[in-house]
């Protein structure tokens, strides 16, 4: 998409959010700089009705970026040796074509408002488009209270290759790891799997819930994830593919050991 179109989208958002105009004026005019500004403004935008003109431009841009990143079909990924229904994949979760990908959300469930933050919540919302925040806001308005730790909600995937996003809030570990933290993380995996099965979904891809901004120890989190998935798959035959999606080499090594 041309630089002029991205600049037009930025102007549309700045018209809604004039409080950011002075900061935006300091951003360079290269395509990369203006695209980063667009992501920042989208991250900052609070839930409110979206214009059809903006949505058309946004969807065209995000669709083109999705194809440029490359779409990965989770059903075509090689299975781990220990279970034909489980796969391990290292990379960007927003590339995965699955019935659902799992987002490690916060209790507000509205996505990350920190401009261009490097968390999974920000990455998923930025790739899906502003419709995802609108959908989450609608869920939260009906619910009337923050999302509890260990539960799950589902939305459409919008501009993601995944059909749906399952949002779950993992435990925050600020000191020593406790049995309560472990139980809450286990509940996240069970809730996501149960919701996927209830909706008739055949494939689901998990990020490493709580191991980033929420500081759950990586090895302990992976042990819980693998245990809960294996236990669920012994009782449920409807889900045909579960992917453990990792981003860091450290996580890949941990999962390779657990799944061997």
Residue map of PLM features:
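Macrodomain-like recognition of ADP-ribose-binding/processing modules
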Residues: 1-260
């Amino acid at each position: 998409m041309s630089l002029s179109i991205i600049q037009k989208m930025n102007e549309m958002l700045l018209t809604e959010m004039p409080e950011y105009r002075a900061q935006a004026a300091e951003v360079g005019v290269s395509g990369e700089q203006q695209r980063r500004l667009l992501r920042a403004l989208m991250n900052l935008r609070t839930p409110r009705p979206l214009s059809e003109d903006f949505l058309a431009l946004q969807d065209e841009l995000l669709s083109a970026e999705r194809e440029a990143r490359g779409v990965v079909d989770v059903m075509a990924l090689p299975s781990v040796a220990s279970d034909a229904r489980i796969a391990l994949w290292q990379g960007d979760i927003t590339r995965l074509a699955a019935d659902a990908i799992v987002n490690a959300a916060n209790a507000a469930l509205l996505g990350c408002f920190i401009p261009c933050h490097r968390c999974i919540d920000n990455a998923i919302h930025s790739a899906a488009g502003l419709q995802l925040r609108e959908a989450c806001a609608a869920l939260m308005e009906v619910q009337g209270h923050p999302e509890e730790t260990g539960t799950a909600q589902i939305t459409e995937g919008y501009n993601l290759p995944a059909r749906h996003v399952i949002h779950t809030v993992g435990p925050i570990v600020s000191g020593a790891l406790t049995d309560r933290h472990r139980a809450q993380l286990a509940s996240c995996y069970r809730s996501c799997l149960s919701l996927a099965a209830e909706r008739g979904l055949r494939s689901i891809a998990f990020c490493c819930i709580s191991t980033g901004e929420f500081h759950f120890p990586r090895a302990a989190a992976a042990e819980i994830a693998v245990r809960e998935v294996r236990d669920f798959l012994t009782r449920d035959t409807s889900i045909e593919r579960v992917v453990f999606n990792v981003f860091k080499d450290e996580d890949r090594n941990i999962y390779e050991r657990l799944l061997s």
